[in-house]
Regions:
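Non-catalytic C-terminal accessory region of glycerolipid acyltransferases
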Residues: 2-12, 100-220
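Catalytic core of membrane glycerolipid acyltransferases/transacylases, capturing the structured
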Residues: 16-18, 25-26, 38-96, 104
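Short gly/ser/thr-rich secondary-structure transition/capping motifs
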Residues: 25-33, 155-159
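A conditional alpha-helix N-cap/helix-loop micro-motif detector
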Residues: 28, 95-99, 128
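A secondary-structure boundary/capping signal
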Residues: 34, 71-72, 88, 118-119, ...
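Residues at the C-termini of beta-strands that transition into short coil/loop
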Residues: 36, 73, 93, 150, ...
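A short beta-turn/loop motif at secondary-structure boundaries
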Residues: 36-39, 167
């Protein structure tokens, strides 16, 4: 992050990507499909299903570009606070309209970076069944395309050594989908327009998840 503003930096996210690669490929066996669908340059939003704590680190280690994730403020405790900030991650208060987080997230996209979002707002079934409007807002406001991402296999079994993690060296599938625009081309940013965009986005995300399950043979 930049000392003056606290904004995340690409350099920090690049360090985070290196750590993610080392950890995820060292502990598990990620199988990455469709990573070429992530634009090689320019702003993009990765919309990731979220059913396990490793989903964020897994994306940091498997995405083809450094990612700045919006992460709940509760994760920024003790030494994790400066660490997460240092690797370019964004702290967000989910209980209110966090204008600092919004500004930093739009700044990432404005600088042509990659913003990672868990559109359900919290960890759950990971099925995109309940989306918050934040994803559509960032996409419509910035004009950045959305790339849906399905992380599958992280909750199928529990590890013997660490029950909170999948078994060591187990396969986790990460499937990137086709990029798409959230807006309808009208340029509207009204609440109604965002609600309509959220419905469209949800349809694309659930469709990608179903396709990813068929492709990988996963049922979770």
């Amino acid at each position: 992050m930049t000392p003056a503003t606290g904004a995340p930096t690409l350099r920090g996210a690049a360090v985070g990507r290196g750590i993610g690669i080392g950890l995820m490929y060292g502990l598990f066996k990620p199988r990455v499909l469709g990573a070429w669908r992530v634009p090689a340059s320019g702003p993009v939003i990765l919309a990731v299903n979220h059913s396990h704590n490793i989903d964020g680190p897994m994306l940091m280690g498997t995405a083809p570009r450094p990612v700045h994730f919006l992460i709940k403020k509760e994760a920024f405790v003790g030494p994790l606070d400066p660490f997460l900030r240092g690797i370019g991650q964004l702290k967000v208060d989910r209980t209110t309209v966090d204008r600092t987080a919004i500004t930093h997230a739009l700044g990432v996209l404005g600088d042509g970076g990659v913003l990672g979002i868990f559109p359900e707002g919290t960890r759950g079934e990971g099925d995109f069944a309940s989306l918050r409007a934040g994803l559509a807002y960032f996409a419509v406001r910035s004009g950045a395309p959305i790339v849906p991402v399905a992380v599958l296999g992280s909750t199928e079994r529990r590890g013997r050594l660490i029950s909170a993690l999948p078994p060591l060296r187990s396969r986790v599938d990460v499937v990137f989908g086709e990029a798409f625009d959230a807006g309808d081309g009208s340029g509207r940013r009204t609440r109604k327009a965002l609600d309509e965009a959220t419905v469209r986005v949800q349809g694309r995300l659930t469709g990608h998840l179903e396709q990813a399950r068929r492709l990988t043979g996963r049922t979770e």
